[in-house]
């Protein structure tokens, strides 16, 4: 029985958006010798491209006289799926006390994105000199690993018996508080149980909280447990306390049916009473850890992001030969379709191993018979609509425009259903191997809104997300209904979407911003949607691919 006056510590949300922390482990092979007598003293400097400049974020230790170093110091970064996060790895010789790569100390460098590293788990690249040529046979290997444990949850069940009675005319009303010890040795409240009225042998309700909340993911961090007798005045009577760690709690309940117990000690009584033993006993009846999988768990476990593009070729875009057309191919400035393609596709392609993307058009009359189609391959190869990388999608788009007649209406359901077909096959495997993301670029209101709602509701039960970017200055108010931010989307028959899978953004909100701003906005929801889908299906990530840096240790620094 709980009391509203107690101000219970709320349970944290099950899933939070934001960054994951990634650790990069680095090794090099075959570094160039600066002279014939000595081997280099290598160090790797990591830079991140941020705010239009390269900024040093981490560096390894220096290893002495080693041409194939395996560095022990990890390079830690915050990872965001929706950001490009370009990285540079600079290798230099620190023999003469150098702290940065100069011409005389530079051994080579390489560039890649953090997304490329985490999607492949292990990346090996040649080192390049400043003139762009390879540094002999020198290579650098980077292995990514997510910092684990930060998303795990703990289920705990406590009871107590023979607690001291603090009430004159009735029994105590016990509750318990749990505190963790911070780095500065202060105590922070992490949980407060409910009050059990008039009972010296209380059984508190099971509760669940994140491992981060309980002990900051440090199983050795001291935990303090305080038991009180509740008083409505707020002056609760102290019964006793004990200390433990999460590791001790796990070990004490490791076997089925095994429980752990502590004496509940009141230090004042212990110091004053010679025969004092305890003020009761507290028992931990259950301690289980629930692994909450993250987006990176699925990506590093082999899940690929299958990216498909759908482009609106309806007449409302305007004649492509006109400078006022949304499809105008100006040599000076890429149109909004191209800008959105590059911004969003440039990130998604890092998560697809073959980097081949199906690209479709809708709302145009197409050769040879110039009949209206709402899901035609823009490379005009219906048997193989895939394009090589985003640059291939852009090239196909440019070749396609002069060959088609912009028409209408703006029907989106056919392309959603087309992408849903392979997603349906993927669902039947029961594995987390491929998640589909459909990018729809359109200039106006959807004509087949009822059919589109039905298609989205169906797709919400599949491993699939939909990103809609509105191009131009049309009224997109109806499009926002598909987003589901104001409540679950329903099909015309009233069936609700199983989850929110649509993100709609008008491009005009970002036309004066950096391209990365659009990508950040439209892709921010994808990691949550991926995790939500697989969690709802009870599908765990695949085992991370085994990665090793080297078979022999480097010389000591």
Curated annotation (Swiss-Prot):
Residues 244-303 are annotated as: Linker region. Ca(2+) 2 binds at residues 167, 229, 231, 237. One of its GO terms (cellular component) is dendrite. SMART domains: C2 (SM00239), VWA (SM00327). Residues 306-526 form the VWFA domain. Its cofactor is Ca(2+). PROSITE patterns: C2 (PS50004), VWFA (PS50234). The keyword Calcium applies. The keyword Calcium applies. It comes from the Eukaryota. Ca(2+) 1 binds at residues 167, 173, 229, 231. InterPro entries: C2_dom (IPR000008), C2_domain_sf (IPR035892), C2B_Copine (IPR037768), Copine (IPR045052), Copine_C (IPR010734), VWF_A (IPR002035), vWFA_dom_sf (IPR036465). GO terms for molecular function: calcium ion binding; calcium-dependent phospholipid binding; phosphatidylserine binding. The C2 domain 1 binds phospholipids in a calcium-independent manner and is not necessary for calcium-mediated translocation and association to the plasma membrane. The C2 domain 2 binds phospholipids in a calcium-dependent manner and is necessary for calcium-mediated translocation and association to the plasma membrane. The linker region contributes to the calcium-dependent translocation and association to the plasma membrane. The VWFA domain is necessary for association with intracellular clathrin-coated vesicles in a calcium-dependent manner. Calcium-dependent phospholipid-binding protein that plays a role in calcium-mediated intracellular processes. Binds phospholipid membranes in a calcium-dependent manner. Plays a role in dendrite formation by melanocytes. This is Copine-6. The lineage of its organism: Eukaryota, Metazoa, Chordata, Craniata, Vertebrata.
